[in-house]
Amino acid sequence: MIHSYATHRNAPVRVGIGEDYYAEEADAADRDEYYSSVQDVLERGDGEDIYQSLNGLLGSTHRDLSYKTARRHLYKTIDRRPDGALYYLYSGEGPKNEEEVDGPNRRRLGNYNCEHVVPQSWFHKRRPMKSDLHHLFTEKVRCNSSRANYNLAEVEGESLPNCGIVDHKDDEFEPHAGKGEVARATMYFLVRHPGYVGDRRVETSPEDLKQLLEWHEQYPVTDYERHRNDTIQDVQGNRNPFIDYPELAEKVDFQSGFAS
């Protein structure tokens, strides 16, 4: 698991510096143990069988955190780069000055907050979806607001520096960075929380899933995501199977995840 430390609760937190940022062997052991009960289905089952097995596993191992607790973990340990600074999802960057990311300065500056890859309005701000760390990411307030509750897609529209492209006509948003991350976060959500996505025009539909699958293939899993995945298991209990086994994206039948 990921090791972290803080010198004081109001001091900047540095986590996983250098080679300790992502412990590959420890993560592999965690992964193998986590999926051991469904491994046979993952290898031999059909798309619906795999979906149902993963849905049961992700749900039974999920600890429902308060939103406050989830964000505390997100900012302090989960969304950190190898140098210990925060990572912004849609720009692929973060604060250059570590003073920006300590608790008091964050509240005073108000320059970043919590982005829900699956917007809160799609699931009426209900828990456990609201605090599910696998689709929560740190983002600049301005960029988070610009994305609003728009669907993720490749679009032409207003370009926002270090953020993305917004198409206000079709209610769509294309991030500047993080396309692989948002694809895998959305696929996780469809498996973990079925029935909340796809019943309104602004939401991801089965047709839109094709674009996410393309991003998933085009932008492979990074050590940042692996660090997130293992660290989230520490605090929330479950994992994102599309980070652990990227090939599952082509095997899972996601139809059961969409609202009817």
Task: Describe the predicted segments one by one.
Residues 52-114, 118-123, 132-135, 141-145:
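Active-site-adjacent structural elements in enzyme catalytic domains
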Residues 1-92, 248-260:
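N-terminal module-boundary/linker segments of secreted carbohydrate-active enzymes
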Residues 101-260:
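Domain-level detector of nuclease and nuclease-like folds
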